[in-house]
Design a protein with these regions (language model features):
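Terminal low-complexity/charged segments
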Residues: 1-217
C-alpha cells in the first residue's frame, strides 16, 4: 500500500485531495457500579458441606478451606472442588440424587493439560435451583510409555459419567478425541470430530503437525 501511494505521488505531484478524515466525537458515560448477581440455590459453603458429609477427602481447588475463602467467592461463581479418582463417580451420583443438591444437569466435561497430569473437570448444575459445581479430578500421566510414543498415546483414564448423565456420552468422546483421556465404562468411546487414524490429540501440549504455524519470539 505504501509503495503504491508513493508511486501515485510521483506520477501526480500536483494532486490534492479534498478528503478529510471524519473526526469521531468521543462520548463519555457515567461509571456504572458492579452489581453482584443474586445467589441461585445453595451457596458454595453449603454445597461443600454437603459433599464433605460423605466424602471427607474433597478440598477446594487452589484454596484453603476457610470461612474467609467462601466469603470471598462471588455469588455466581461455581464451587470448584478437587476429588479423588476413587470418589469421582460416586460423588457425582450422590450430588445428582441427594434431595438437597439435585444436580441433574451435566453442563460440560473438559480437561486441562499440565506437564505431568491432566485436570479432568465436570460441571454439574441443579436445573431447578441453579447452583453449580466443578468436580475436578487430577489424572497423572502414564510415565511407562516411551517418550517417542507419548504424543500419539492414551496417557490417562477416568470413570465415565455416561451412565449417570446421557449428555456425558458425547462430551467424554470430545475429551477423548482432543486430549487422549480414556473413560472406563463408556459404551461408545471413539473419536467424535477427527478420523480414527488421526495422529495425536490436538489440545495436548505435545501435539505437533506439519501445518501448524509456530509463533516466533
Amino acid at each position: 500500500m505504501a509503495e503504491a501511494r508513493a508511486h501515485f505521488k510521483e506520477r501526480n505531484p500536483d494532486y490534492k485531495s479534498d478528503y478529510r478524515p471524519t473526526r469521531i466525537v468521543k462520548e463519555t458515560f457515567p461509571e456504572v457500579s458492579y452489581r453482584a448477581r443474586k445467589q441461585q440455590g445453595l451457596s458454595q459453603k453449603e454445597l461443600f458441606g454437603i459433599a464433605q458429609e460423605k466424602f471427607q477427602g474433597v478440598s477446594l481447588y487452589g484454596l484453603e478451606v476457610s470461612d474467609e475463602a467462601f466469603a470471598a467467592m462471588e455469588s455466581d461463581t461455581p464451587l470448584d472442588i478437587l476429588v479423588s479418582r476413587e470418589d469421582y463417580l460416586t460423588l457425582a451420583e450422590f450430588l445428582k440424587n441427594d434431595p438437597r443438591t439435585q444436580m441433574d444437569y451435566l453442563i460440560d466435561v473438559t480437561a486441562v493439560d499440565w506437564k505431568d497430569h491432566f485436570d479432568l473437570i465436570a460441571q454439574l448444575m441443579c436445573s431447578e435451583k441453579g447452583h453449580k459445581i466443578f468436580l475436578r479430578l487430577s489424572l497423572p500421566k502414564d510415565d511407562s510409555i516411551p517418550e517417542e510414543k507419548r504424543a500419539k498415546s492414551i496417557l490417562a483414564s477416568a470413570p465415565s459419567l455416561s451412565k449417570l448423565y446421557l449428555g456425558a456420552n458425547w462430551k467424554e468422546r470430545e475429551v477423548f478425541d482432543m486430549f487422549g483421556i480414556a473413560f472406563e465404562g463408556h459404551d461408545d468411546l471413539r473419536r467424535i470430530f477427527l478420523d480414527e487414524d488421526f495422529p495425536g490429540y490436538p489440545l495436548r501440549k505435545d501435539f505437533t503437525h506439519p501445518h501448524i504455524i509456530s509463533r516466533e519470539g
